Regions:
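Divalent-cation-assisted or electrostatically stabilized phosphate/pyrophosphate-binding catalytic cores
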Residues: 1-43, 66-71, 92-133, 137, ...
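C-terminal domain/tail detector
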Residues: 128-160
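Catalytic P-loop NTPase motifs of RecA-like helicase/translocase cores
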Residues: 89
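A mid-sequence, solvent-exposed acidic-amphipathic segment
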Residues: 29-83
Length: 164
């Protein structure tokens, strides 16, 4: 299968995915005892940051640029986790599935999630504005400056995202 081939070709990334998804499961298991959106998003944030850390090596991208890329990846992972939680809120409630934005304290956590999402968008934009892109800069800029906020606004209004 494609997953087995990828795991064989990239064992470090496979180990990262397995480790972070296990951490995500553990974080979700204790969430309602210690509700922290920072803690619940950390494993997925680490997964995306780690994925970008393994981006092809390029001398021009080393040192501070790679650190910035990893940081932006972590913020994007946090954003993806929270936007998915907001988007799936009703469906998760209907099916009795875990969602960090439901239950007691849910409305306050939803407001906090929206604040974190907007903050993450700003931080991703700030980091990407400092990175030296040699191609596709306008596409990335549109995704970061227009796409992410547009998705957040749609989900905030209750519009369900279409599956890809």
């Amino acid at each position: 299968s494609a997953a087995k081939k990828a795991a064989g070709d990239y064992p470090e990334l496979d180990a990262l995915f397995v480790r972070q998804l296990e951490q995500q499961e553990k974080a979700e298991a204790v969430f309602f005892r210690q509700p922290s959106l920072e803690d619940i998003t950390a494993p997925f944030a680490s997964l995306l940051g780690g994925l970008l850390e393994h981006a092809p090596k390029d001398d021009a991208l080393e040192s501070e640029y790679r650190e910035g890329l990893v940081y932006a990846g972590r913020k994007l992972g946090q954003w993806v986790y929270l936007i998915d939680a907001l988007d799936d809120l009703e469906k998760d409630a209907e099916k009795g599935r875990f969602n960090p934005l439901s239950g007691e304290g849910g409305p306050a956590r939803r407001a906090e999630a929206l604040r974190i999402l907007e903050e993450a968008e700003d931080q991703i934009d700030a980091v990407f504005s400092l990175l030296p892109f040699y191609r596709d800069a306008s596409i990335l800029s549109n995704i970061i400056q227009l796409g992410l906020p547009d998705v957040r606004h749609k989900v905030e209004k209750g519009q369900t995202l279409r599956p890809l």
